[in-house]
């Protein structure tokens, strides 16, 4: 065994998976996981833990995997993470734990994410669940939103003895995990639903179809329903658009709507009653993980798909693995290209998109080189569908109906990043509702910090 090289992970063949919604990555078996775990040198000053937003004790759980003690490995992980099977699949490990791995300075870093996934999947298959709190403390906390921030906050509070109720606006719990991430990357019934069941097994209650700010307000939850504190983890579901001519044409979608139709409403299923446009030639504007998800979904629905991104490949914000998979599956990358107008016929249906070539100039405030238009380089792409994947912002419904809850100019809730405390007493917030669209694991980290903040607040009362 070459300790500098990772144990390869089995995947569906690219041609085969491009025509189905089954999970792409097949994961490790026990023997492969133990062999990969044996590459870990068990650093005393583990940088990988510092790179993890929820501070999983990575060397300890990997040591248990190496020794074949998978249940103990799961116990270690579940002390820090409420959603290990999710994180093992969708976290950007290359810029977090694996990016800090000492092995990676000379050779391949340890496949921490794949090992976490293996442990979580093994625990699920063997009926192992996290340990609930020994007793309740009599205090009630409301959690708004059942995405990664809300589930993490709720799970941690339940372990501390709080009576926690999650209020979810949609008809199904999971937030972005169910409506935003495709089945081929994150299976819903086999993975997400089981993770939610684990959170519920801690004593967490989930009420769906409750739109906080409309069905009930935060003030009513605290003053009339008897909740001692509230955590807002409602995410950022309001899509952004470019503001170019033609964006109101038929068959221009936000990635948020397009993926929700497919993921939550199962529009990819021929028996589903939820319609979705089966475009023949689709452009997805954007370069993040959501853009890759939308593009790979459209591909599976039979389209020729183009990613249109105004910067170069080096600046793509999507995970390296997602870009690699998209390329393998046949998605075309039109880089250094920016849309300037969406074209349509006399009935308002998309016929194409006028674009202009870009080149990279000086770095902007983000540190990435600023894209600059190349004069006279305009051209037209013939298309029948355009999907805009330009990020999302929080829906202002909650903040606009809650007195004393301040937001910034982007309508994000202002909260202390260390404990989630907002400008309204007893109300905490975290995840995309505070930061704008970000990653699952960062939302989980915020939920974890807020749970600690809420516990400190209520313990002092």
Task: Briefly describe each language-model feature range.
Residues 17-35, 56-89, 106-133, 262-263:
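Ferredoxin-type iron-sulfur electron-transfer modules in oxidoreductases and energy-metabolism complexes
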Residues 38-57, 82-105:
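Local cysteine-cluster metal-coordination motifs and their immediate loop/turn environment
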Residues 140-165, 291-299:
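N-terminal Rossmann-like FAD-binding beta1-loop-alpha1 element of flavoenzymes
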Residues 433-460:
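A conserved FAD-binding loop/helix module that cradles the flavin
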């Amino acid at each position: 065994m070459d300790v500098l090289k990772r144990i390869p992970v089995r995947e569906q063949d690219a041609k085969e998976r491009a025509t189905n919604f089954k999970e792409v990555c097949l994961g490790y078996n026990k023997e492969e996981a133990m062999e990969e775990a044996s590459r870990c040198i068990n650093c005393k000053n583990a940088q990988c833990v510092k790179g993890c937003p929820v501070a999983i004790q990575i060397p300890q759980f990997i040591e248990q995997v190496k020794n074949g003690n998978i249940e103990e490995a799961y116990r270690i992980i579940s002390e820090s993470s409420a959603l290990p099977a999710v994180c093992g699949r969708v976290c950007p490990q290359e810029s977090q734990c694996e990016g800090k791995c000492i092995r990676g300075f000379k050779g391949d870093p340890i496949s921490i994410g794949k090992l976490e996934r293996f442990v979580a999947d093994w625990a699920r298959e063997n009926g192992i669940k996290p340990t609930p709190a020994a007793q309740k403390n009599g205090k009630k906390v409301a959690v708004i939103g059942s995405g990664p921030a809300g589930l993490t906050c709720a799970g941690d509070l339940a372990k501390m003895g709080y009576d926690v109720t999650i209020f979810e606006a949609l008809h199904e719990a999971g937030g972005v995990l169910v409506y935003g991430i495709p089945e081929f990357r994150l299976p819903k019934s086999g993975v997400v639903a089981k993770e939610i069941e684990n959170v519920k097994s801690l004593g967490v209650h989930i009420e769906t179809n409750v739109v906080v700010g409309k069905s009930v307000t935060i003030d009513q939850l605290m003053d009339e329903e008897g909740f001692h504190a509230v955590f807002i983890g409602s995410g950022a579901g309001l899509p952004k658009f470019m503001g170019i001519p033609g964006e109101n044409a038929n068959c221009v979608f936000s990635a948020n709507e397009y993926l929700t139709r497919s993921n939550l409403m199962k529009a990819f299923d021929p028996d589903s009653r939820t319609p979705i446009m089966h475009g023949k030639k689709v452009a997805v504007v954007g370069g993040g993980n959501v853009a890759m998800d939308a593009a790979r979904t459209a591909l599976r629905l039979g389209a020729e798909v183009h990613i249109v991104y105004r910067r170069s490949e080096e600046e793509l914000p999507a995970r390296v693995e997602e870009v690699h998979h998209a390329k393998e599956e046949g998605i075309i990358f039109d880089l250094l290209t920016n849309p300037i107008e969406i074209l349509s016929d006399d009935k308002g249906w998309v016929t194409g998109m006028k674009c202009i070539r870009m080149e990279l100039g000086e770095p902007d405030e983000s540190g990435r080189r600023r894209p600059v238009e190349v004069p006279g380089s305009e051209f037209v792409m013939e298309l029948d569908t355009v999907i805009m994947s330009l990020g999302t912002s929080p829906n202002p419904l909650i903040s606009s109906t809650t007195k004393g809850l301040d937001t910034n100019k982007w309508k994000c809730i202002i909260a202390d990043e260390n404990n989630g405390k907002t400008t309204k007493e007893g109300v905490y917030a975290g995840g995309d509702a505070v930061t704008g669209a970000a990653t699952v694991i960062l939302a989980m980290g915020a939920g974890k910090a807020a749970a600690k903040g809420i516990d400190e607040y209520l313990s002092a009362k």
